[in-house]
């Protein structure tokens, strides 16, 4: 099977690929990392502190704007306003706040830095030049540790590349997933 993971989903995909190498044909890791750095842990602590206030608006304002590039956020102001109208009520629900805290806490001690080299399947690592949540340096670490991995940067995009540049993101994912096991032949 081919597996793709974005951000936290990439962490899950890494763990699955390491533990089940015989089940993964191709792996795509987008805007993710091999470990939760101290810096990222502090960001998560901040998100949890805001979630504990019960304010969906405060949670939205703390977590959502930073996942987009500044250019996208400003260019797509109307779209962002619609997202805000949907997400603030959602983030205001106590059950959602509890689940967001559990999600953040579940990656607190995540560290596969010493195991990602065990990934042997063809792997595509997608980075984004404007990702300030999981910066490109984290994907470079993955690329250096996963032998034979391919590395690509989506320029101008932030952490939410699937929204910011869906054409590039989709082309990369589908192109890599559907690539012949024999590679590219001309």
Regions found by a protein language model. Give the residues of each.
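Conserved alpha/beta-hydrolase catalytic His-Asp/Glu region
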Residues: 38-40, 58-115
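Short beta-strand/loop motif that positions the catalytic acidic residue
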Residues: 119, 125-127, 131
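Catalytic active-site module of serine/aspartate enzymes centered on a nucleophile-bearing elbow/loop
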Residues: 149-186
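Short alpha-helix in the alpha/beta-hydrolase fold that links the catalytic acid
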Residues: 112, 121, 135-144
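Alpha/beta-hydrolase fold nucleophile elbow
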Residues: 1-7
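Active-site loop->helix "elbow" adjoining a glycine-rich segment at hydrolase catalytic centers
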Residues: 7-10, 20
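Flexible "cap/lid" loop of the alpha/beta hydrolase fold
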Residues: 14, 18-19, 25-55
